[in-house]
Amino acid sequence: LNFDFDKSNIKPQYYDLLKNIKEFVEQNNYEMTIVGHTDSIGSNQYNFGLSRRRAESVKAKLLEFGLAEDRIVGIEAMGEEQPIATNATKEGRAQNRRVEFKLVQRETVPMPVENK
């Protein structure tokens, strides 16, 4: 899920992807942490804030689509610290302006068995 330069709004082209993620999380008993990232343009401090706004924007959209709030266990802001592509090119920077999801399966509590 990628973002335009200096933006945190989600493009409508990603709505179906977010709905699919919501369904996957619910059907497979996962909870998630949403992790925001930026390219390297701008100050480190500004980019941490922008990456947080991106993650919060995704959280809000998932909740709007009906995901239970307790499925989202964290928001992380990485700023420009974890690029997946070079920041030396326009294309690379576009790839770095993203949000990722860390999924963890919830533990299921076994039902007690009554002895008769």
Q: Where on the chain are the PLM-derived regions?
A:
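Envelope-exposed proteins and targeting segments
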Residues: 1, 6, 28-30, 71, ...
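Short, solvent-exposed beta-strand/turn patches at coil↔beta or beta↔helix junctions
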Residues: 1-23, 39-45
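Generic alpha-helical secondary structure signal
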Residues: 7, 18-19, 28, 50, ...
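Structured segments of extracytoplasmic/periplasmic soluble domains
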Residues: 21-31, 58-65
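Periplasmic OmpA-like peptidoglycan-binding domain that tethers envelope proteins to the cell wall
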Residues: 37-116
